[in-house]
Swiss-Prot record:
The lineage of its organism: Bacteria, Pseudomonadati, Pseudomonadota, Gammaproteobacteria, Pseudomonadales. Residues 123-217 form the Rhodanese domain. The active site is at C177. The keyword Secreted does not apply. Residues 282-293 have a biased composition (Basic and acidic residues). Gene3D superfamilies: 3.30.70.100, Rhodanese-like domain (3.40.250.10). Its EC number is 1.14.-.-. Residues 282-312 are annotated as: Disordered. It comes from Pseudomonas paraeruginosa (strain DSM 24068 / PA7) (Pseudomonas aeruginosa (strain PA7)). This is tRNA uridine(34) hydroxylase.
């Protein structure tokens, strides 16, 4: 049995004292050997962490001791090696950045749809199904029939909706994302924009993959995740993708055969667009990573591009 538990969690809840929560939360993570990144904002908490079974249980016991977080849910998967390099708790304006004032999932959200009911909803021809994730995530897997907004960050989602859809014509809208947070916030935005019947997948793609048998699944491909596994398959086992440190795009087995793929430095997606300064920085970064690996030391550089997607 694998020893590392990976827990994805979020909850929209008003945390007026979120600044004061940072230090005790960080200490709880450190005391229990839990790694990863958690985001705190006045609107709630979001993140993905990993550790031993005991460490993860201790973290959630601490979180749930706060009445505001007593019902916080999370999704678990498992791996053989620690997928995070560092332990961080960041203070943010939003736990997932949409950038539209007044959007508040604590006050208004769409209708939650359980994983077991999702297939029936998205099979309805009157339902517009939108993938709220970024383009590089959608490229490696999505639901059958889903629209790809081709956004590079969640901040672009509102403009995409304004440019393509009309509440008067698009009566039913269903949305999904990796763990549920982006589509929940998107549903709040959509309601504010005048859309009336707005649905979103409770627990996101990860909950769907966990609960729906593969033979009944309408999911196609792998699912991008926010840790060093890069992707997971339908059974939540680690996929075969790597990730380019320069552009953050997932890199397939085929991509790694390209002459433009240099581990840690470039891939076929970004080779033509990299400046020499960026290449030089990437080479130095990769050199430090390899030296740390040879010494069996933690990742030497504080910021891992994989974790930045939490905020976008």
């Amino acid at each position: 049995m694998t020893s590392i538990v990976v827990a994805a969690l979020y909850k929209f809840v008003t945390l007026d004292d979120y600044v004061a929560l940072r230090e005790p939360l960080l200490q709880t993570l450190l005391d229990n050997g839990v790694k990863g990144t958690l985001l705190l904002a006045e609107e709630g908490i979001n993140g993905t962490v990993s550790g031993s079974r005991e460490g993860i249980d201790a973290l959630f016991a601490w979180l749930r001791s706060d009445p505001r977080l007593a019902d916080i849910e999370h999704k678990e998967s498992y791996c053989d090696e620690q997928p995070f390099y560092r332990t961080k708790v960041k203070l943010k304006k939003e736990i997932v950045t949409l950038g539209v004032p007044g959007v508040d999932p604590n006050k208004r959200v769409g209708q939650y749809v359980e994983a077991k009911d999702w297939n029936a909803l998205i099979s309805d021809p009157e339902v517009l199904l939108i993938d709220t994730r970024n383009d590089y995530e959608v490229a490696i897997g999505t639901f059958e029939g889903a629209v790809d907004p081709k956004t590079r960050s969640f901040r672009e989602f509102p403009e995409y909706i304004k440019a393509h859809y009309d509440p008067a014509r698009h009566k039913k809208v269903a949305m999904f994302c990796t763990g549920g947070i982006r589509c929940e916030k998107a549903s709040s935005y959509m309601l504010g924009a005048g859309f009336e019947e707005v649905f979103h997948l409770r627990g996101g793609i990860l909950k769907y993959l966990e609960e729906v048998p593969q033979e009944q699944s309408l999911w196609r491909g792998d699912c991008f995740v926010f840790d060093n596994r890069v992707t997971v398959r339908h059974d939540l086992s680690e996929g075969e993708y790597d990730q380019c440190h320069a552009c953050r795009n997932p890199v397939s087995v085929e991509d790694r055969q390209s002459e433009h793929y240099v581990p840690g430095i470039s891939c076929p997606h970004c080779w033509d667009s990299l400046s020499e300064k960026t290449r030089a920085g990437a080479r130095e970064r990769q050199k430090q990573i390899e030296l740390a690996r040879q010494r069996n030391q933690p990742h030497p550089l504080g910021r891992d591009p994989r974790q930045s997607t939490l905020e976008n």
